[in-house]
């Protein structure tokens, strides 16, 4: 079961540009397009944000599922992350 802390370590290990994601943080625009994970409605929410507009939003009941979804999204630009999805 992956946690946000473990996800953060994986992304750091693979030098994923921090402008591509936001994990449990509320900060000004990170990048033009980025993936944001935060708590919402008793679970977790993952949003794709483009120019400060949410263009996609998914809700997950558990932390591990939300983390896996973030990895899947970031794997488009960082294919080495796919190893954590198997």
Regions found by a protein language model. Give the residues of each.
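Conserved aromatic
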Residues: 1, 60-61
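Negatively charged, low-complexity tracts enriched in Asp/Glu with abundant Ser/Thr
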Residues: 1-29, 84
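N-proximal short alpha-helices
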Residues: 10, 39-43, 83
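Short aromatic-glycine-(Arg/Gly/Cys) micro-motifs in beta-strand/loop hairpins
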Residues: 28-55, 73
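Short, intrinsically disordered/low-complexity patches at protein termini
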Residues: 42-43, 69-70, 79-81
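A short, charged, amphipathic alpha-helix used as a generic interaction element across diverse proteins
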Residues: 61-75
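Intrinsically disordered, low-complexity charged/polar segments
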Residues: 76-86
């Amino acid at each position: 079961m992956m946690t946000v802390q473990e996800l953060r370590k994986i992304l750091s290990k693979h030098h994923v540009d921090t402008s591509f994601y936001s994990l449990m943080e509320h900060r000004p625009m990170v990048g033009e397009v980025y993936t944001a994970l935060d708590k919402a409605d008793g679970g977790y929410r993952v949003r794709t944000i483009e120019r400060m507009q949410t263009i996609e939003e998914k809700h997950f009941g558990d932390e591990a599922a939300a983390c896996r979804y973030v990895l899947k999204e970031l794997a488009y630009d960082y294919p080495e992350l796919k190893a954590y999805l198997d």
